[in-house]
Amino acid sequence: MQIGIPKELRARERRVALAPSGVRALVQQGHQVWVEAGAGAGAGFADADYESAGATIVFGRLEAILRSEILACVHAPEPAEYELLQPGQTVIAFWALPTVRPDEIAILQERGITAIGLEVIEEADGSAPVLTAMSEIAGGLAAIIGASLLLNEFGGKGILIGGTTGVPQAQLVILGAGVLGRAAARVALGLGAQVTMLDTSIPRLRAVVNELGRPVTTMLSTLPNLEKALGFADLVLGA
């Protein structure tokens, strides 16, 4: 198969659809991979890394699209690019399929394009591996960014999230005990915060305790509990 990896166009987007290690695995299976020059730069991967993995570097988005049978992107092509897609081509990306306009879907259907949304890929047990990975990253970053926003420099209360001798740690309240919330809690605990999690699901809260242990305080998400938690929180994360 011919697989194309174009450079992402959106501002401040640093992700790339495939790392050099993934390219190497595909090449070893007999596939040919075309990577647009600079596609991995934002993620810390040089063109030379992709070449060492067996990819061929192309010097334009159009060439990456036209050479590929499977086009792998982070963000789906813009509607203006649909005419560049080849009949029968497969495009794997975050399509946000429920939000795609019907007329745009019709164009893709007319051109015989197979659109695979990364956001709807599921394992046999119903879990979503790509969304889970993104949520874990977002949760960890949320805890780190939140910790920095507690500093005076950023308009915060001047609190060190982990506290210090004689000074208590920050109180972090997380609303939601899903993948993102658990990831945020894990990082916040590592930073030394006192973490309280609220959710409407007792099984989810139980899973948090089983995964992270007793350092996390759990509360059923009711109005009285919300009012109580928000009253003592130094930092609140909606997850």
Residue ranges of predicted features:
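Short, hinge-like loop/turn segments at secondary-structure boundaries
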Residues: 50-54, 132-136, 213-217, 237
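Conserved PLP-enzyme active-site core in the AAT-like
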Residues: 57-61, 226, 239
